[in-house]
Amino acid sequence: MEFLETVNRKIVENRTEMLSSLSKLISVPSVAGEGSEEKPFGEEVDRAYRLMLQMGEDAGFSIFDADGYGGHIDYDGTEDGVIGIVGHLDVVPEGDGWDFEPYGGEIADGYVHGRGTMDDKGPVIASFYAMKALKQCGFEPAKTVRLILGLDEETGWKGMQYYLERTPDLPDAGFTPDGDFPVIRAEKGILTFDIIAKFPKSRGKGLELTSLTGGTAHNAVPDFAKAVISDTAGGGYDLIRETVAGCREKYDWDISCRGVGRSLEISVRGKSAHAAKPHQGVNAISILMDFLGRLTFLNDGTSDFVSFYNDRIGFDLHGERIGCAFEDEDSGKLTFNAAMIDVDRNAAKLTVNIRYPVSCSGEQVYAGIMEVLDGYGYGIVKGKQQLPINIDADSHLVSVLMKTYRSHTGDFESEPLVIGGGTYARTFDNVVAFGARFPGEPELGHMKNEKISADNMVRLAQIYAEAVYELAKAED
């Protein structure tokens, strides 16, 4: 269509400006932190949010702010109805080992580098410039096009709930650019919870697990864990050092130890990945617990918890030994991620993130796990549950988005997807994830050296512009 070709050319013209805007947004380290009444998710998240709202105002769009909890940028329509584009501006912690500054926003080698380039600042900027190009080319949408800005997608979604309670009208349909192409029509349910164990007081002398920590986010495979061990009997450290060396050689683990005062610190490095795809990571907590299982601790409670972990969780990714190995034909196997751990002399807390199939319920998952935990005398503290979504592949929304994707890529083989990831799509009735990762591209969100191709930023903006046009235009 001639009009959309004009829009595509405008997006190409805006390329430098678009990349500069993304670089500026990446430079804000918007990890959600301690907040205030005016800045609920901390200074940096609010700074990224205000920067995005200002872009909207400068482009001639109207904006709405729900008291700093979230907001939107509106491309006003001539009729009733809203088409939503739902993104987020918060990011997960950067971690270690980057080749570029994680918040440098550096443009080099054809990429924009930094935390949030793929998840989700890059796609948000591409969506914004899709709207901007349509406006610059004179498009008058029948339905209002709304870019919704979430601020705590990575940490709890309280901001989105607050926003939804205060916005006057919700989208009739839309997409979130926070997943994979071609279209994600269904998402597994999500459970996050803590397994709690209490230890009796130890008596006598021997090895004591003073502390054990690992992981930084419930929705990521932990890439680092460390334990501090004290030896009140004496003579145990040499054996631990020998065991570390043996495991490093036999299993190729990235494990090391060093003296810290009168204690010994054992550190493990794994590989981070999104919790929905634990097979792409290496769980540092599981490696460390496997190692600790080779030692004998003075406190029986400590030893029992280590044994529980290795016997019931270990390196399993699907809950096979802890009572929750559900699966279905539509969405595959449940995934189980031991995400964070905090152990001291008195207690242990293990934070778990599960993605369960669309055909089962969270209650079924909990029932199987609690039956196992009861046998150990351990408790469970339930966190927030996110219910699965399942939109028909033949629906109008999915059909329009599939047609748009195919017209830009020539990919007629890929079909609508079902995933374990949790996006803002599940907070709305008729919203699906639509990009921004193309088939065959590596998964870089939540990982070190996150980046996005400059060419893909242009392609994303063009795809999203056509999708917005088709969904928001007046009916023939």
Report the location of each language-model feature.
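N-terminal helical capping/dimerization or prosegment-like subdomains
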Residues: 1-84, 91-94, 351, 452, ...
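Acidic/histidine-rich catalytic neighborhood of metal-dependent amide-processing enzymes
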Residues: 120-200, 206, 241-245, 249-252, ...
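Active-site metal-coordination/substrate-binding segment of hydrolases
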Residues: 81-149, 155, 167, 172, ...
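An extended, acidic, His-containing surface patch that forms the Zn2+-binding/catalytic region
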Residues: 64, 272-345, 355-364, 379-476
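Buried hydrophobic packing segments
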Residues: 52, 124-134, 163, 288-291, ...
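Phosphate-handling active-site elements
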Residues: 108-110, 131-146, 239, 297-303, ...
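Acidic-enriched catalytic cores of C-N bond-cleaving enzymes acting on peptides and small amides
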Residues: 185-188, 192-213, 218-271, 275-336, ...
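A generic structural motif
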Residues: 71-73, 227, 262-269, 350-352, ...
